[in-house]
């Protein structure tokens, strides 16, 4: 039986035509607070990175280690975001597409093709393909998912220092019972997404004394 890593590497070869191919993924579509972060990565075939996988199946420590390795070994990478204000103005889908586009445009090298995790594509001036579950199938998308996830988790840790009552360091902005209870008691902070229903309800309700 072939290992998960070898299967991932073979899938990368199957998806990647000759030339520079960028993998793109995002982190932070579902949370109630903070930006949505996207990353684009062009890997170096001469410097393979072992253990790439969908960021969600990796431990935080493993993601941090791979983050450093990706930044060191990739031909180039770019991380971008769409702000809370842009999410509330446009909606989370359009903000995600905006962050992905910014990440691709931020690459130092222009790819000949872009592979995007999911089933939708941002507007780009290069050929692109959406790949469902691409973060588990294509190495460059896996790398992008790790960069985006680590970047956003670090942002949540910083936000926790500003607003510890919400517990951002633990739930990363997702609508856990703890987070919803904190919203009910304390109301929303400036980094909460006003267009998301739980936050909107918290803003309409009187803050508990």
From Swiss-Prot:
* Annotated GO CC locations: cytoplasm; ribonuclease H2 complex
How does the cofactor attach, per the note? Manganese or magnesium. Binds 1 divalent metal ion per monomer in the absence of substrate. May bind a second metal ion after substrate binding.
Q: Which residues form the RNase H type-2 domain?
A: 19-208
Q: Which domain of life does the protein's organism represent?
A: Bacteria
Q: Which Gene3D superfamilies match?
A: Ribonuclease H-like superfamily/Ribonuclease H
Instruction: List localization entries.
Output: Cytoplasm
Gene Ontology MF terms in the entry? manganese ion binding; RNA binding; RNA-DNA hybrid ribonuclease activity
Coiled-coil region(s) = none
Residues recorded as binding a divalent metal cation, renumbered to this chain, are 25-26, 117
Q: Which EC numbers characterise this protein's activity in its record?
A: 3.1.26.4
The cross-references to HAMAP family, in alphabetical order and at most eight, read: RNase_HII_B
> What does this protein's UniProt record list under function?
Endonuclease that specifically degrades the RNA of RNA-DNA hybrids.
Question: Family per UniProt?
Answer: Belongs to the RNase HII family.
Annotated protein name in UniProt: Ribonuclease HII
Q: Which organism is it from?
A: Acidovorax ebreus (strain TPSY)
Which taxonomic lineage is given here? Bacteria, Pseudomonadati, Pseudomonadota, Betaproteobacteria, Burkholderiales
Q: What is the name of the gene encoding this protein? A: rnhB
């Amino acid at each position: 039986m072939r290992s998960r890593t070898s299967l991932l590497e073979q899938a990368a070869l199957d998806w990647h035509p000759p030339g520079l191919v960028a993998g793109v993924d995002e982190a932070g579509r579902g949370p109630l607070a903070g930006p949505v972060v996207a990353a684009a990565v062009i890997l170096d075939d001469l410097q393979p990175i072992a253990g790439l996988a969908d960021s969600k199946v990796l431990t935080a420590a493993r993601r941090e280690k791979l983050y450093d390795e990706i930044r060191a070994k990739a031909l180039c990478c770019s991380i971008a975001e769409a702000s809370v204000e842009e999410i509330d103005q446009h909606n989370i889908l359009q903000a995600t597409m905006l962050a992905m586009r910014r990440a691709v445009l931020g690459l130092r090298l222009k790819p000949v093709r872009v592979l995007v995790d999911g089933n939708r594509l941002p507007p780009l001036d290069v050929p692109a393909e959406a790949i469902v579950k691409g973060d588990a199938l294509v190495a460059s998308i896996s790398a992008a998912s790790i960069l985006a996830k680590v970047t956003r988790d670090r942002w949540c840790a910083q936000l926790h220092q500003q607003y510890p009552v919400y517990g951002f360091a633990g739930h990363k902005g997702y609508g856990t019972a703890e987070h919803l209870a904190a919203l009910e008691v304390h109301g929303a902070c400036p980094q909460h997404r006003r267009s998301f229903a739980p936050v909107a309800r918290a803003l309409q309700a009187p803050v508990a004394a």
